[in-house]
Regions:
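Glycine-rich N-terminal segment of FAD-binding domains in flavoprotein oxidoreductases
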Residues: 1-42, 51-57
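A structural signal for short, hydrophobic beta-strand segments that form beta-sheets
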Residues: 2-3, 64-67, 104
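Gly/Ser/Thr-rich beta-alpha loop segments that engage phosphate groups in nucleotides
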Residues: 19, 48-49, 57, 63, ...
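Flexible loop/turn segments at secondary-structure boundaries
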Residues: 20-22, 43-45, 111, 154-157
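Short loop/turn motifs at secondary-structure junctions and domain boundaries
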Residues: 33, 61-65
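Short, glycine/charge-rich beta-strand/loop segments that flank catalytic centers
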Residues: 36-49, 68, 150-152
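Catalytic micro-motifs at enzyme active sites that drive phosphoryl/nucleotidyl and oxygen chemistry
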Residues: 56-60, 90-93
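C-terminal substrate-binding/cap subdomain adjacent to the FAD-binding core in PCMH-type
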Residues: 68-167
């Protein structure tokens, strides 16, 4: 569940069992969006943080870049608050640590402004993809998400999906 929310600071503190979809539903009326999450919204925040998942956001990298702090429960029952500045070694060991350090119980996340996007689909030969990405996607200021997927048996024709901001 949501523990704290500040639309003006663009932050939210949640229990680790909440799904990304529930967060987005909660913040959407405030014109906000999750800053970084994996492609699908049905995963839990705790699970996503424990593997330091990534999405298809251009220029943002893995989910750790949007995490302000976590509450971590160690195997012996000790509870620690951790962030980049406080207990940083626990923060960076837990995010992407697959539960080896402890269980992430809560997380404070950065949010972003919510923008309307348009989905663009393309198929092309795999040999043309690098030039397409370099020339059409990488420096496009409107491009928000992008990925190219290969599906059997068409391993030479990626399905390209881009989402771009619209006015």
């Amino acid at each position: 569940q949501v523990l704290a929310f500040s639309p003006s600071d663009k932050t939210i503190r949640v229990q680790a069992g909440i799904r990304w979809r529930a967060i987005q539903r909660f913040i959407d009326p405030h014109g906000l969006s999750v800053k970084v999450m994996q492609t699908y919204a049905n995963f839990t925040v705790g699970g996503s943080l424990s593997v330091n998942c990534h999405g298809r956001y251009l220029g943002l990298g893995p989910v750790v870049q949007s995490v302000r702090s976590i509450k971590l429960v160690l195997a012996d029952g000790q509870v620690f608050d951790a962030s980049r500045e406080h207990n940083a070694e626990l923060f960076f060991a837990a995010i992407g640590g697959y539960g080896a350090v402890g269980v992430i119980a809560e997380a404070e996340l950065d949010l972003a402004d919510n923008h309307l996007v348009q989905r663009l689909n393309r198929k092309m030969g795999v040999g043309d993809y690098l030039a397409h990405f370099r020339d059409q996607i990488r420096n496009d200021k409107q491009a928000v998400f992008h990925n190219a997927d290969l599906y059997p048996p068409h391993f030479t024709r990626p399905q390209i999906v881009s989402l771009a901001e619209v006015d």
